[in-house]
Amino acid sequence: MVLRLDDTDVERNTEASVNSIFDGLRWLDLGWDEEYKQSQRLALHRQIADAIFQKGLAYRDFTPAHTGDGEKSGAGQTWLFNPGMRELSRAESDRRAGAGEPFALRFLVPRGLGEQVRFTDAVYGEQIKAADDIEDFALLRSDGMPTYHLASCADDIDIRISHIIRGQDHLSNTYKHVLIFKAAQGAGLALPQFAHLPLLVAPDGSKLSKRRHGPVVSVTTYRDAGFLSPAFINFLCLLGWSPKDDRTVMTRQELIDAFSLEGINRANAVVNFKEPATTPEETFDPKAVWLNAEHIRALPVADLSALLLPIVREAGFQVTAEKMNAISPLIRERIKFLRDVLTAADFFFVDQLPPYDPAELIPQKGDAAMALRVLTRAREVLGGAEFTHDGLDQALRAAAQELGLKAGQMFQPIRVAACGRKNAPPLFETLVVLGKETTLQRIEEAIRGMK
């Protein structure tokens, strides 16, 4: 895999932005074998620009204001070319360049000949545009720096890129690139395969952008929130593409095996986040959150524990790998993000539970007196019980029968006393992980709180 940084735009190219790209790629496990920076390949770019110029397919533009492309003329009309510069004789052009006058180098787009520029796109099919409608775009700016068009094409030619895949908003640029490819390589050589992908848009239909939707478009936002990289890749692949069957949750290898350019949709893909988000979860598309939860559930316990343990320790809790291995299967079905471990399993990590409402101890169709009887009997029973799933099951169900209660009425006060909440993992497994000493201590504290 080749990684090429298109860094010729000096204003936008910062160390922070480059490091962010590298961090995101590494998190996604997209390693690379070779690394190129366009800014270090300027000699190649200028060599190809000069070759095009020597073929008579480019000209110097000495107009001071012309440092790039996309200029406008009056009444909102798109600028196409400057006749005075386009028709400047080679001798006059050489004289002015030799005198040190700065110039931009522009491609000499064929005009008045009825020519068409065409290419076949793997997603959007046959694309045709009249050459007369394409401006004489810049190859080199007046400061000598190559434009995006020239640098990208020059590097694609040199590195022998076979497929050029980018956003649909680059379709208009591709006509210019076809002209560059043919001018640099010769008309008889095959073009790369072009494929333009549908755009990712916000719920309001606007294109996603760093300026407006910063966190949503940053890969590191998903990483820091606790997404698994395979889940994020799964989500990205399903934006504008779907397999031929009805699968949604797919591994990396399954995605590789099923993917084809022909399966990409032409319609823009909507990323359904809330704007503005009122909770961290609303920053993300619900489908992405669901996929992440599914990928978490599919992880082997040891792998999940290895991901959760650094998060727990970073939060200041001293937890052993052995204990984390015991906790992970209990919360695997209950978390959507890796960082949810800090709220789903916090009662496993603390010595003292935070305050909770004693009313939570009261079982369904019961009262405070019933809750107190349950906890008192549980303290007696658990003191002599074997702290295994089967041992706790047998002891507590027998105690419920003695008290004339349903199992749920027996279990709820114990669960709240042990975990500080009604919504917690399965009771017996939870008590085993907490251990006899901690369980009895918390039940004792709950009893004192009710008196």
Language model features: what each stretch is:
Residues 21, 52, 56, 107, ...:
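Residue-level signal for inorganic ion chemistry
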